[in-house]
């Protein structure tokens, strides 16, 4: 904002990935819009009930009106008042199983078709990392197999991404993340994944040994076991 006021530079385009669809995001989005900053949201979390629904017939109806999800081609939710572009499967009758990582890759491919081969395995990493369950998951895994990745390798990469993200927090780790994902430094990719995965397993084992003795297990009436861990 200071550069805009002092030097007339363009305001940034904010792209929110895996975040931004819910009513909890409205205050932050509203603040950005007050400064006339353009905002794009790519998210797969439940955005709240639809305010309006546009159907295949072209008719727009109230969000509370019952209809088949398959008939919805566009919907609006509360945050749409504060964003310029909102991509979320729920807006077209879908659900959270098409994850933000998969959505972002699809959008990237639409913007620049030349990256298709470079990124075609990324949606599979995203959906497996988020433990999604949908027909599209198998389609993405099949696409990734064309680059030589099997399901276990993809899961391993997803675990490594989560592990590294924990340590990076809000730091810029683009170089190492690109290496883990296999979109850059391809000669380093296998070694990086193996090294991080071994360390990840060690940390998980340590945490499990510390946590399991302190878990209280309760069997519910329906036969499901409910495990409680006091982390205080």
Identify the residue ranges that each predicted region occupies.
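Gly/His-enriched, cation/cofactor- and phosphate-binding structural elements
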Residues: 10, 171, 175-232
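Generic alpha-helical structural element
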Residues: 93-96, 169, 185
């Amino acid at each position: 904002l200071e550069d805009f006021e002092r030097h007339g530079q363009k305001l940034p385009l904010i792209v929110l990935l895996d975040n931004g669809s819910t009513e909890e995001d409205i205050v932050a989005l509203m603040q950005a819009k007050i400064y006339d900053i353009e905002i794009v949201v790519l998210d797969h979390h439940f955005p709240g009930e639809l305010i309006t629904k546009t159907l295949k017939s072209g008719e727009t109806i109230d969000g509370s009106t019952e209809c088949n999800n398959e008939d919805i081609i566009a919907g609006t939710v509360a945050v749409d008042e504060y964003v310029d572009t909102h991509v979320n499967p729920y807006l077209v009758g879908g659900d959270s199983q098409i994850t933000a990582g998969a959505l972002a890759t699809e959008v990237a491919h639409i913007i620049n078709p030349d990256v298709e081969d470079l990124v075609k395995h990324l949606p599979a990493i995203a959906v497996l990392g988020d433990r999604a369950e949908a027909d599209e998951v198998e389609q993405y895994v099949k696409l990734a197999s064309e680059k030589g990745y099997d399901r276990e390798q993809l899961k391993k990469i997803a675990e490594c991404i989560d592990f590294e993200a924990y340590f990076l927090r809000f730091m810029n780790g683009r170089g190492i993340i690109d290496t883990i994902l296999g979109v850059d430094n391809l000669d380093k990719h296998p070694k990086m994944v193996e090294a991080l995965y071994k360390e990840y397993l060690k940390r998980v084992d340590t945490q499990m040994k510390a946590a399991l003795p302190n878990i209280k297990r309760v069997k519910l009436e329906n036969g499901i076991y409910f495990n409680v861990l006091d982390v205080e």
